[in-house]
């Protein structure tokens, strides 16, 4: 066992994963988490890896880059993916979890490791010695100021938003049908079909509803993947009909016809009593939220157990500050991980924590750090956030477009993605034997 200690600040998805990767390599870890001593604007519990937005970790198939990313993480013994697999709920081809069971599983896994010491306190200064900063998009003001001084850069910032969660028992199941788009996987979504007239009425209410006002100094920059539904609506009706309310592949089994629009609800807990409204992240005032949602067929008497909220997200300019190892360029024993690096999404955040944890361990053990190759989803994300244009840096999800091009061009997209996936997994399996 190595006696040198690594500090990990933040026990979210990235911090928990980093702590796990360090601990399993025999490194002593001091894991700092300020909750519940000090809560954030979006968290509700003191559990590690609490999911504050959707309960879906997105696609679980190798036809999608985030599915490949998960498979790579399984090969590297990821605590986050291990817990997600254990706490999954039905979601078609996606990996969705019971958020409470999932957070408890991660907490137990990390907290109970003999090499991990948990300190429940707010970190206001960056500690000396090997450190992984994974404080997330809701980093406290005092630490944010420290980071600003350290980096010499102004933060970029944006908002993302959480969708409402509703009780299944309050839905009118006569108007709702169970189906997954194109009948892929098991039927896992509740679908609320709309006629054009119903959609127009809903659209009018949504675009005229009141939102919670933003502070004057705050500038609105939304990441496309978690854009508030009311902001999307103001871009035009078609934005919604080609977005979260897209009816394609969701024909109503009663009529055999495609509705004009569809609102989908996805199971949010293992018991199947709670559902979240897919793509309906919102910052509407709570009274307005309920009135707008009641216009969705089947939700006329809806009981909302958690209203949608919006919170500020903060991330650093990684292209100018980080190496692909997630190591800070100006201090080699300091690593960053999670959404604050500009990776976007639960799985991507955990993957960055995995890399930062592995490399912090390598540093302490006096070994060469690992730069994951661009042939892998993990490596392509690290490469993107550290080499893309500094001036226009924006968060990025895992996607096949980030991976290194195949040596032979394949025109068929499905076949091309299959080849990307095969190469990525073969590459990571080889790497996993050496780290």
UniProtKB/Swiss-Prot annotation:
It is an enzyme of class 2 (transferase). Its main location: cytoplasm. This is Methylenetetrahydrofolate--tRNA-(uracil-5-)-methyltransferase TrmFO. It comes from the Bacteria. The keyword Transferase applies. Keywords: Cytoplasm, FAD, Flavoprotein, Methyltransferase, NAD, NADP, Transferase, tRNA processing. One of its GO terms (molecular function) is tRNA (uracil(54)-C5)-methyltransferase activity, 5,10-methylenetetrahydrofolate-dependent. It comes from Bacillus velezensis (strain DSM 23117 / BGSC 10A6 / LMG 26770 / FZB42) (Bacillus amyloliquefaciens subsp. plantarum). FAD binds at residues 10-15. Its cofactor is FAD. Pfam families: GIDA. GO terms for cellular component: cytosol. GO terms for biological process: tRNA methylation; tRNA wobble uridine modification. It catalyses: uridine(54) in tRNA + (6R)-5,10-methylene-5,6,7,8-tetrahydrofolate + NADH + H(+) = 5-methyluridine(54) in tRNA + (6S)-5,6,7,8-tetrahydrofolate + NAD(+); uridine(54) in tRNA + (6R)-5,10-methylene-5,6,7,8-tetrahydrofolate + NADPH + H(+) = 5-methyluridine(54) in tRNA + (6S)-5,6,7,8-tetrahydrofolate + NADP(+). Belongs to the MnmG family. TrmFO subfamily. Catalyzes the folate-dependent formation of 5-methyl-uridine at position 54 (M-5-U54) in all tRNAs. Its EC number is 2.1.1.74. It is found in: Cytoplasm.
